[in-house]
Amino acid sequence: MFLGTYTPKLDDKGRLTLPAKFRDALAGGLMVTKSQDHSLAVYPRDEFEKLARRASQASRSNPEARAFLRSLAAATDEQHPDAQGRITLSADHRRYANLSKDCVVIGSVDYLEIWDAQAWQEYQQAHEENFSAATDETLRDII
């Protein structure tokens, strides 16, 4: 399970060091793809394969699902962390997420999100009030 907030730096070669506590779960390979709100999603390879299979099954008859699958496949990059736990983010991914040197990696239960530190701070400020409302309304049946 991926939980917590971490603040790694992006180096000049576009490499990001993954949090040490997640490296074992990602050692078998991982998939980096574009996500909502101009962030990146990092899935363990097996989790991504499940997601892609579900999208592929739905895509045969649904134009929106086919478009989603195309976008997902085109925007995804397979990575294997190096000995120091670093992955190289493509120039396209860095541009999409507006990544500067200061990044934030957050756990999102079954995957990680990579954000530019400033964008993450702005996102949190903009959605702080929504947290209480979501807890009351959206999560009523879960919690």
Swiss-Prot record:
Domain SpoVT-AbrB: 5-47, 76-119
Domain of life according to the entry: Bacteria
Keyword line: Cytoplasm, DNA-binding, Repeat, Transcription, Transcription regulation
Residue pairs linked by disulfide bridges in the UniProt entry: none
Coiled-coil residues: none
Subcellular location, record wording: Cytoplasm, Nucleoid
Gene Ontology biological process: negative regulation of DNA-templated transcription initiation
SUPFAM superfamilies named in the record: AbrB/MazE/MraZ-like (SSF89447)
Gene Ontology CC: cytoplasm; nucleoid
Pfam families: MraZ
GO function terms (MF aspect): DNA-binding transcription factor activity; transcription cis-regulatory region binding
Subunit structure: Forms oligomers.
Similarity comment: family membership: Belongs to the MraZ family.
Protein name per Swiss-Prot or TrEMBL: Transcriptional regulator MraZ
Gene behind the chain: mraZ
